[in-house]
């Protein structure tokens, strides 16, 4: 059985997903494409030779009779509108982050999906599909290091563009840790604080960089995340879990160890897409397979909502310098883990 997919948004990630569905993954075919830049959408379809119909209107694509599932990879502020339209049409929808640009927007999607009565939404948080994070979670869940007490994490980028602002360290960068660490611990956050160390001379004038985000979970686990987006040396993701009886670390990406000229070295990646490229394939294949099975199990609209609420608290903490509470309603049974 082949799942007919419509893709809204043909920017970089949209093009990547179209290629995945068309040439790398199984059980899916891109039959419809839309973008606000209609000529770009036509060019993508022609360049890839996929024969998909190009729609000028995203809502027409969503409601097209031959489109069975939707991928939303358009500009972030449009996500809520298109996801709600997909739910109304009763069609499964994979939405790249953010699910919506506000916590209330995410809650609107949660409410619409629960009213529909069936999970239709998967959010594009890819790290739970990364082999390294899955291995780390397996160690935690096995009890081999006892209960997790502390996590020491880092999210480092070589550099960022002029448009990158201080709050984007939360909304664009930390958001991945917000999601994956909650999944890793099977826990939710109750407070956030942000500390600004000495500013790097390499940071843009308007940007506070690095930042340290301190999170506390409902079970009492303490998490510190260093966000440093001008580290210069590469793209580097670190996660160390300190348990009662041992420590577990996220494995480094596989690379050749080089002994040469009196040095022992390993390559460090520079592009985030290279670091998690396999996870992108796995998450989208999971969505395709889950739609075929009639039951979505990946990151949910509830996960998107809780990430947005947590991010809002972190941004508030950036401004206040205080420990900000993170207040979440109880997770509905509708979103209980499968």
From Swiss-Prot:
Involved in the oxidation of myo-inositol (MI) to 2-keto-myo-inositol (2KMI or 2-inosose). One of its GO terms (biological process) is inositol catabolic process. Homotetramer. This is Inositol 2-dehydrogenase. Belongs to the Gfo/Idh/MocA family. InterPro entries: Gfo-Idh-MocA_inositol_DH (IPR050424), Gfo/Idh/MocA-like_OxRdtase_C (IPR004104), Gfo/Idh/MocA-like_OxRdtase_N (IPR000683), MI/DCI_dehydrogenase (IPR023794), NAD(P)-bd_dom_sf (IPR036291). The gene is iolG. Its EC number is 1.1.1.18. It comes from Azotobacter vinelandii (strain DJ / ATCC BAA-1303). PANTHER family: INOSITOL 2-DEHYDROGENASE, PTHR43593.
